[in-house]
Amino acid sequence: MARLAPIVPSWPDLPANIGALASTRESGVSAAPYDDGQGGGGLNLGLHCGDEAAQVHENRALLAALLPGRPAWLAQVHGVAVVDAATVQPGQAVQVADASIASTPGVVCAVMTADCLPVLFADLDGKVVGAAHAGWRGLAAGVLAETVKAMRAAGAGEITAWMGPAIGPTKFEVGPDVRDAFVCCALQGEDDALRTAFKPCPGRDGKFMADIFALARLFLARDGVTRVFGGTHCTATDSARFYSYRRDNVTGRLASLIWIK
């Protein structure tokens, strides 16, 4: 088995005392359709997507070897709830939330995705970190704003963010319901940004190609988070590295994680 080689964010603003990474589908033990797409074992980290639990736990152990502590896994529901990752303990019921924050060294915030957008946060003083699962429903409902709010309540100063692997703008076809969910909550002066984020799909009336990275930048800017990086990895087009629900339907889950060292 090859050694894990997760994505280390290209994140110039990340304080030196903060660690962060995003997993790929490579170098795990899961069999098809949760494999690495090349005939080898896949690093599926989701217990809820049909894979053998023993394989998922082994994959999680492989990932844990790179971390200072156990990831605070959540039961994600496309909502806006944010929890303190330090309260997520083994042996307890999994907490229902789509984001977590941490201000204690060694506590690992984690979100799982397979096309939805993972966003990692850190304040520039390295005192508070966070991770959010932002599918279009959670994004429109305000999960990023709630995460920023929770971080500031925990003492964060200026916040920087990194957008991890998600479905890119050439693959994310949506209907008018998705576009309307964002248009209805648009603020004055955001019309141009929304037009850029929802481009009509040629030859498919009523369909749009959505840019979830652009939408996240728009929502983050509302809360004063303008130091935003990432948004360069498309899960749907890079089958060698990423799981994608839109592409494969039955598939594994990736993780994006952040912690204070």
Q: Can you name each region flagged by the protein language model?
A:
Residues 1-261:
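Active-site microenvironment for binding and transforming phosphate-containing groups
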